[in-house]
Amino acid sequence: MNKLVEDCMRLGFGMMRLPRIEGTNDIDLEHTKRMVDAFIEAGGKYFDTAFIYEGSEEATKATLCDRYPRESYYLADKLNASDFAAKNEKEAKNEINISLERTRAGYLDFYLLHGIDEGNHDKFDSYGIWDYMKQLKSEGVIRHYGFSFHSTPEHLEQLLTDHPDVEFVQLQINYADWEDTLICSRRCYEIATRHGKPVIVMEPVKGGKLANPPQAVKDILQRANPDASFASWAVRYAASLPWKQM
């Protein structure tokens, strides 16, 4: 595998489900600052946000970009071409400008076509987003581009065949979904590796569900190591994959 970064630990920080101020929907920035600081102090560098994560890019600016030297972290952001995010090509291609304004990051280390599935694939094609990604990279606005994926293994095979210049793929991978017949984590992972693409993992703890798995699963994990948290088992599983970048 051609690693995208060499000086980064295998755990990233998702700026999606951030703590909220009690009784409101406002992100608790002070709490988030402490989380960001703890992550960086532990050796973390990779942060992930998205255009459609409400308040996330602004929180990334306040808790990360305004407080740390730009070269000290990697930032991933995402372009969403679905109808609720962009009504036309112009709006889709302008998302990068809004994201850079919100984060004040200057540039993006990783830029993803967000959540490709069979329902929005045609928008990325008709808006010329694939070539737009190459343009942004040539201009130095982004360093690497890829896509996050929520569809079938056959669809992933088609995308990677049609777009061999894509540098990485972000997949939902965890031990609960590895053999799931809808998410098909294993099959998608194997397709990505066969195409030589580094894999960035999302949902390693399945939105927190694997931090509190069914009792039968708890019993197995506690017998194996009573001192390990359930969440740590989930993270270790995802981190053990050899083609996993993050």
Ranges and model annotations:
Residues M1-Y73, Y132, S138:
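N-terminal binding-site loop/beta-alpha segment at the start of enzyme catalytic domains
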Residues V5-L11, G43-Y46, P69-Y73, A105-D109, ...:
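Short, well-ordered coil/turn segments that N-cap beta-strands
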Residues G14, A50-Y53, Y111-H114, S148, ...:
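Conserved residues at the C-terminal ends of beta-strands
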Residues M16-E30, K78-E91, G119-D122, A216-A228:
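Active-site mouth loops of central-metabolism enzymes
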Residues S56-D66, N88-L100, R104, H121-D131, ...:
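Distinct, well-ordered alpha-helical segments
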Residues E71-F84, Y111-I116:
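A short, structured active-site edge motif that brings together acidic residues
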Residues I116-M246:
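Beta/alpha (TIM)-barrel catalytic core signal, keyed to glycine-rich beta->alpha loops juxtaposed to Asp/Glu
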